[in-house]
């Protein structure tokens, strides 16, 4: 425990949206004069930002709260698990306070009650212009909205985070510019539903960076493309308006990367999920997009073992994967989530069947991925360096988002620094990662691409 300046620690779990919430809390605490630490021992109190989406995440959150109580004893809990009435208090009755996601004021109030705010004159220069970030200096998450209007039957996010509320586009662009000026090279735009950005405000036009900008995915992407840094739009729901950004990719204004979670490819399963179910239309769009943008990288996620899923329906999913030839794919076995409608739709798929289907799915996709990665050998690509150690540099290409996609290993990259852009030639590949060597003389460079991912 600290004896002088009041000190707060935080443990942030879950998705990038939760990371942004944690960063906002830390930024405000720093502005109020609190010292921040990642040590249980040094902290006067610890904030745990939880995830409550699936059972394993709930257990991880409860375990982390328990660890914080054991190591520190004064714990404030926030986040999605906090929105589930009584769950935390039942297991850990000694926590100081519990609040739901994005409950910034409640968390700050709890901190004030646990640790009196330091007496100081709150000068703005206590906090860096970009705020407190939990990510490396060269990339940052940018949250553009809160909540979701969809009611996918496997998901309980709307019950925890509410309906979609878009941030003003002028605020989003202003924050993005501050991040760029602080040295951020890559922005990862996050929300529950990026393609729906602005629907709640009827896509109204505001002035952002001195020019009229529509509050929409296209309007935001166009504005961010002027910043000269990489920008990835995550969680792009497969709306027709995704078509709008493809021509921008073809013109070289956006990076050719599209993250579009599809979840399944059998029409009846998609209907049960309350997801868009026109699989043929999806395949047509993918084909059309690749005709316009030949080097387009498409990332998606799928669920196997959804309640009632038959072998024939699973085979429809495999057939889709074979035909679509997606570049980046994540697969999850269906996990019952307390409060999810899907739990009561049909008989659950046995665990051993879910595992067997998962294995077959991944075997097929790994072969597709391996073929696509092998095709990159001998090509020169631009990468962004994430870290450098005794074995060389680790970077990502335009096709790779941090943590969820592959990496580019550069054994001869000891002279590079995190945040550098560099041209490399690929000399080896496996199912997910590349190995490359720098080409030509290294010169730090700007980039004017935006990534939709």
From Swiss-Prot:
* Family annotation (HAMAP family): MTTase_RimO
**Is Nucleotide-binding there in the keyword field?**
no
What GO terms in the biological process aspect are recorded for it? tRNA modification
Residue span(s) of domain MTTase N-terminal: 6-116
How is this protein named in the record? Ribosomal protein uS12 methylthiotransferase RimO
Q: Which residues form a coiled coil?
A: none
Give the keywords, sorted.
4Fe-4S, Cytoplasm, Iron, Iron-sulfur, Metal-binding, S-adenosyl-L-methionine, Transferase
Q: Which family does it belong to?
A: Belongs to the methylthiotransferase family. RimO subfamily.
- EC no. given is 2.8.4.4
């Amino acid at each position: 425990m600290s004896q002088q300046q009041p000190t707060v620690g935080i443990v942030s779990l879950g998705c990038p949206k939760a990371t942004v919430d944690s960063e906002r809390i830390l930024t405000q605490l720093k502005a109020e004069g609190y010292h921040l630490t990642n040590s249980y021992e040094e902290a006067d109190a610890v904030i745990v930002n939880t995830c409550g989406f699936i059972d394993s995440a709930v257990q991880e959150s409860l375990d982390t709260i328990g660890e914080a109580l054991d190591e520190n004893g004064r714990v404030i809990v926030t986040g999605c698990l906090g929105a589930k009435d009584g769950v935390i208090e039942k297991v850990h009755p000694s926590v100081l306070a519990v609040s739901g996601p994005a409950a910034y004021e409640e968390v700050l109030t709890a901190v004030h009650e646990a640790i009196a705010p330091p007496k100081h004159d709150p000068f703005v220069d206590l906090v860096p212009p970009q705020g407190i970030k939990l990510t490396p200096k060269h990339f940052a998450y940018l949250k553009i909205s809160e909540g979701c209007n969809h009611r996918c039957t496997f998901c309980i996010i709307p019950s925890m985070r509410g309906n979609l509320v878009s941030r003003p586009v002028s605020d989003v662009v202003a924050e993005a510019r501050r991040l760029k000026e602080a040295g951020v090279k890559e922005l990862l735009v996050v929300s529950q539903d990026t393609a729906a950005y602005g629907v709640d405000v009827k896509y109204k036009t505001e002035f952002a960076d001195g020019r009229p900008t529509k509050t929409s995915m296209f309007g935001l992407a166009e504005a961010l493309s002027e910043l000269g840094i990489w920008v990835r739009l995550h969680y792009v729901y497969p709306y027709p308006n995704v078509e709008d950004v493809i021509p921008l990719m073809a013109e070289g204004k956006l990076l050719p990367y599209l993250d579009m979670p599809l979840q399944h490819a059998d029409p009846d399963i998609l209907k049960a999920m309350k997801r868009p179910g026109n699989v043929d239309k999806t395949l047509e769009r993918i084909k059309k997009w690749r005709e316009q943008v030949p080097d387009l990288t498409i990332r998606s996620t799928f669920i196997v073992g959804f309640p009632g899923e038959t072998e024939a329906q699973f085979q429809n999913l495999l057939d889709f994967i074979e035909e679509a030839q997606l570049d980046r794919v994540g697969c999850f076995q269906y996990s019952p989530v307390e409060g999810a409608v899907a739990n009561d739709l049909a008989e659950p798929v046995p665990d051993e069947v879910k595992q067997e289907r998962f294995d077959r799915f991944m075997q097929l996709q790994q072969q597709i991925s391996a073929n696509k990665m092998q095709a990159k050998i001998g090509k020169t690509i631009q990468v962004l360096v994430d870290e450098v150690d005794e074995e060389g540099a680790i970077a990502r290409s335009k096709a790779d988002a941090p943590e969820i996609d592959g990496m580019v290993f550069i054994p001869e990259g000891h002279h590079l620094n995190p945040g550098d852009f560099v041209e490399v030639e690929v000399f080896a590949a496996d199912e997910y990662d590349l190995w490359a060597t720098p080409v030509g003389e290294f010169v730090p460079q700007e980039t004017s691409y935006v990534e939709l991912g």
